[in-house]
Amino acid sequence: MNDRELMFLPAHEQKRLIVEKVISSVEMVEASYRRIAELEPQLNAFITLDEDGAMSAARSADAQLAQGKNPGVLHGVPIAVKDLEVTKGLRTTLGSTFFKNWIPDYDSVAVQRIRATGAVIIGKTNTPEFGNREETFTDIAATCNNPWDPTRMPGGSSGGTASAIAAGMCSIGTGSDGGGSVRLPASFCGIFGHKPTHGRIPRYGGQAKPAYNSAGTSGPMSNDVRDSAILNQALSGFDDRDPGSIKGAVPDYLIDLENGIDGMRIGTTMTLGISDVNDDVATAVEDSWFAFSELGANVENLAIAFDPMPREAWWTLWTAGQEAMYGHLADERPEDLMPYTLEMIEHGRTLSGADVSVALRNVQNLQLQLHQVFQEYDLILAPTNAAVAWPHLQPPEKIGSEINQDDMAGINYGAIPFTMVFNSSFNPASSIPCGFGEGGMPVGLQIIGGYDDDATVLRASRAFEQARPWSGDRPPVS
């Protein structure tokens, strides 16, 4: 088996080969780095690599097996970590010039739990500054490219992880999702990404700093649904350093993963009552809905109308959080912040306490509206994005019949209107490949579940993956 074939194996298969001593962790990690050496110059998926640290961890993983110790769920498997997660002893830039030399002395909760799985961290992946854009560009690293077409963006803000996995540099990684930042690049790059129920994965040391953040959570990304379910299981669980994390036992995301969706009630919507979509996206998404009917689900059109629209509340809380977390940097050296970050901070400074209170009230109303929807349905199906990946900094001028909106610090809201809803509502949501659109670029289907029902989202994703296999599709740069 060559390096490419190894890196396109599911992570749980890589782990099996390592545990059965068909291949060592050292050999698996070496294969990953050879792939990175070959492909990274075209994709810029990583900000920092840690070959010495990774090889040391791989040798330790092999030694533990030789000593008869029980392996972790991802024992010896190479994994990419988004550079918004704090990593002890490994440079953590947050995509910002301000942190270009920061080497933390602690791990985030997510990274602690990754290490506990036995996975080997190979490096920190590319991200826009503080995760603030749907494209992955920043002053700290070269612009990240999409392996399906390197002249196009991979999405953001977890664009580096998505690009690395899609190209076969590794099979699994982490992202974080504050407005779609796992699901958007998963869709644009043709991989699977899951945004968990908020609070399932503690945020300490990750995207959320000590300020109110209604939006952000870490999440798994992979070429295989089971891999993401395994990682989601490993990362979930209460930690008292994040009082917002959910107490009590973590649901088992694997026990019913293969049990299909027969009898489930599913509502489909092409617009979520929010925005039009481009024809190529609509064609692929609508075709995917038939698979759910064929699998025995009761599928019907869902008419939904949010009141008020979710966009403004999300934008208010996001920019208020940016000002609270990073406003002091704008006071110190505004020239060293990316323009999009500075614009968010400046908008945050225009907000009053009443503005934030109204936004919080509207988020609660949104949560109640969706709670009512999920009394009738087990799942919602919708597009992940309204358009496929576009050339760098050249978003489509129109989405369907509507002018594309880009008045949120350059964020092209009209092309990505469907994800941030479920950040504000806290619902679990995945993006899974469902076809191809303009230019042969991937299209993603968003699968949304009721609050704390990640298990059903992952189960439905697995059923769709089996009915419409996609992981054999490989991009030109791979």
Which residues fall in each region the model found?
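An N-terminal boundary/leader segment
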Residues: 1-55, 294-296, 473-478
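Short, well-ordered beta-strand elements within core beta-sheets of diverse protein domains
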Residues: 14-20, 99-103, 216-223, 346-351, ...
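Acyltransferase
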Residues: 22, 27-30, 59-62, 252-255, ...
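Long amphipathic alpha-helix in the N-terminal Rossmann-like dinucleotide-binding domain
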Residues: 52-62, 117-119, 128
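Short helix-loop capping/hinge segments that flank enzyme active sites or metal/cofactor-binding pockets
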Residues: 74-94, 255-270, 317-371, 384-388, ...
